[in-house]
Amino acid sequence: MLISRYTGIPILKDTLYAHPYEAVGEFQFDDSVVAVFPDMIQRSVPGYQTILTGIGELTAKYAQPNSQLYDLGCSLGAATLTMRRKAPQGSQIIAVDTSQPMIERAKEHIEGFHSDIPVRLLCDDMTQIPIENASVVVINFTLQFIEPSARQVLLDKIYQGLKPGGILILSEKIHFESAELQEAIEHLQLQFKRANGYSELEISQKRASLENVLISDSEATHLNRLQQSGFKAANIWFQAYNFASFLAIKA
């Protein structure tokens, strides 16, 4: 069994869509997904480990003592653990996910690593929790799963809850306004999945399961939202194919 060197999480192979289904249901973060999630995301998202490393380095630079750090949509706690390694004394991390199986497994993983930085795990909707006294907020590939109409409101709340000098790290699958670019870059991402061992059946069934669940935005839409929230400095700091991570800094 492989173990992630970033999180210590056991990596079980993702075979959820390896067998044909008569009808593919909507993707859910249930027990079956939790069991294979580290393998799923590493084989599906190019640059994922680089983003985790960057989250740690940005936490080291921008996290403020006696402040709160948020991981909104924490899944198994990979970003939480990365942040905690770099967080200053006196800070605490609030990690939130709507999936109870994710929260339960995240608790096991986080408790497996000693740290003086406390982590508060919440099974809740990120759009409903208060953001207060924050110096770092991370949304790592989870904004795309909430209703588009709720996204601006959430970013507004995050901006208001950030301390001056605080940051938002927002990682998302993006789409392109140009149909030609969309086709070309999507081809590269599909080739990445094929190279990582996913079959055509797995790729097609996974895509069908996500069709009405993951709703992506363009780079321009993300940047416009961030600007509308009040961020004066915001841009992509990392991109691999159609996966991008934005950094927004509150003045």
From Swiss-Prot:
CDD domains: AdoMet_MTases (cd02440). Gene3D superfamilies: Vaccinia Virus protein VP39. The keyword Cytoplasm does not apply. S-adenosyl-L-methionine binds at residues 48, 73-75, 140, 207. Keywords: S-adenosyl-L-methionine, Transferase. SUPFAM superfamilies: S-adenosyl-L-methionine-dependent methyltransferases. One of its GO terms (biological process) is tRNA wobble uridine modification. Coiled coil: none annotated. It is an enzyme of class 2 (transferase). It catalyses: prephenate + S-adenosyl-L-methionine = carboxy-S-adenosyl-L-methionine + 3-phenylpyruvate + H2O. GO terms for molecular function: carboxyl- or carbamoyltransferase activity; S-adenosyl-L-methionine binding. InterPro entries: CmoA (IPR005271), Methyltransf_25 (IPR041698), SAM-dependent_MTases_sf (IPR029063). Homodimer. Catalyzes the conversion of S-adenosyl-L-methionine (SAM) to carboxy-S-adenosyl-L-methionine (Cx-SAM). This is Carboxy-S-adenosyl-L-methionine synthase. The gene is cmoA.
